[in-house]
Amino acid sequence: MLLTIDVGNSDTVFGLFEGEDLLEHWRVSSKGRRTADEWAVVVQNLLHFDSLIHGDIDGIAMCCTVPMVQNEMRQMFRRHYGDVPAVIVEPGVKTGVPIRMDNPKEVGSDRIVNALAAARLYGGPAVVVDFGTATTFDAVSARGEYVGGAIAPGIDISVEALSKRGAQLHMVEIIKPRSVIAKNTTEALRSGIVYGFAGQVDGIVDRMAQELTDDVDDVTVVATGGLAPLVVDECETVDVHEPWLTLIGLRMIFERNT
């Protein structure tokens, strides 16, 4: 089985594939420093929790946006999974995605993985919206090229900043409000968060689609990321919600490199 690992600034998501089937997935916090051995304990506990053992893993694929974690993960692979082929998405790894950027090396590996998965699953042109620590928008051409994107503050950090800077505002559970026109502060915050971010997504996606092609109806918009369920149903431009897009892309990249 293939173990896929998507390390983000807030969470690390693990996925276990058998062939093309995602058998299981887990989410743990990326915050706080863990050593290579501690990450190995996390992985082993997750596998044993589902009655899986070390010997079941015959491949590993990872993308990571946190350099410190990537270094520890790399050591963990060598120390605890030395006989298992491991692919880390970084410069030199075959992705099959031409990167049309001023500096291709500065593009986050998760964004390239998402672009590959979107192009392979749905075809181009496409826009991937990833709701994470930041909300990222990634544009894929009709030829499957990564042609650029946009980065906006994510939902959680925006809410946190608002509660810290607003003397009479507080943290709220982010759920769909009863109406856009709220009757109390809690509902007003929820309305602004849910419909504000949905409007942001629709606005940026519309503009990207116009730059990608003359026929905007040809553009497939794919939403992913841990925070997508909070607003994706209110986004008029989103065609597909694929929560495991990054894990699927990692599986595809592993297959290209082994």
Curated annotation (Swiss-Prot):
Residues annotated as binding ATP: 6-13, 133
Signal peptide: none
Protein name: Type III pantothenate kinase
Residues reported to bind substrate: 108-111, 185
Binding-site positions, K(+): 130
Single GO molecular function: metal ion binding
Any single GO CC term annotated in Swiss-Prot or TrEMBL for this entry: cytoplasm
Chain's role: Catalyzes the phosphorylation of pantothenate (Pan), the first step in CoA biosynthesis.
Organism: Thermobifida fusca (strain YX)
EC numbers for this chain: 2.7.1.33
Keywords, alphabetical: ATP-binding, Coenzyme A biosynthesis, Cytoplasm, Kinase, Metal-binding, Nucleotide-binding, Potassium, Transferase
Pfam families named in the record: Pan_kinase
Requisite cofactors: NH4(+); K(+)
Subunit structure: Homodimer.
Name of the coding gene: coaX
Active site per database record: 110
Family per record: Belongs to the type III pantothenate kinase family.
Tree of life domain: Bacteria
